[in-house]
């Protein structure tokens, strides 16, 4: 499939697709290069200011894409925990001999926590972003 067709279809796809993210980075890089070239050619302070604004735009775009990725991971974890809880509830409801266990689980549900395996790079990136 053509790059332009993929880009056009990614506009109508919910979320951020790799083609759209790559295109945004290429566009920001081109904008930074143009303003750098204009500054070198004209030595105008205005071009230098626009160059730094373009860099800030690129950094904010990158930050936004990372936050979207974190939100997607958190949403996936939440959905998997909800489906796991529904599966546990369904298995307990099918076995009537576990009524006491089910009531114990319901009473302790506020204090119990579940652990999930999250890739270490995501946790490290999230921790680094929060500490900054």
From Swiss-Prot:
Signal peptide: none annotated. It is found in: Endoplasmic reticulum membrane. InterPro entries: Pkr1. The keyword Electron transport does not apply. Residues 41-47 are lumenal. The chain crosses the membrane at residues 20-40, 48-68. It comes from the Eukaryota. Keywords: Endoplasmic reticulum, Membrane, Transmembrane, Transmembrane helix. The keyword rRNA-binding does not apply. Pfam families: Pkr1 (PF08636). Residues 80-132 are annotated as: Disordered. Residues 1-19, 69-132 are cytoplasmic. Functions together with the other V-type ATPase assembly factors in the endoplasmic reticulum to efficiently assemble the V-type ATPase membrane sector V(0). This is V-type ATPase assembly factor pkr1. It comes from Schizosaccharomyces pombe (strain 972 / ATCC 24843).
């Amino acid at each position: 499939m053509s790059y332009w067709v993929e880009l056009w279809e990614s506009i109508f796809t919910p979320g951020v697709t790799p083609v759209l993210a790559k295109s945004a980075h290429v566009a920001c890089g081109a904008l930074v290069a143009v303003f750098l070239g204009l500054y070198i050619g004209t030595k105008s302070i205005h071009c230098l200011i626009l160059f730094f604004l373009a860099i800030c735009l690129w950094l904010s775009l990158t930050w936004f894409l990372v936050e979207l990725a974190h939100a997607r991971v958190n949403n996936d974890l939440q959905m998997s925990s909800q489906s796991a809880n529904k599966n546990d509830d369904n298995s307990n409801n099918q076995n009537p001999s576990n009524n006491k266990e089910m009531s114990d689980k319901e009473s302790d549900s506020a204090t119990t926590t579940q652990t999930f395996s999250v890739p270490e790079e995501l946790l490290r990136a999230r921790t680094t972003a929060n500490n900054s």
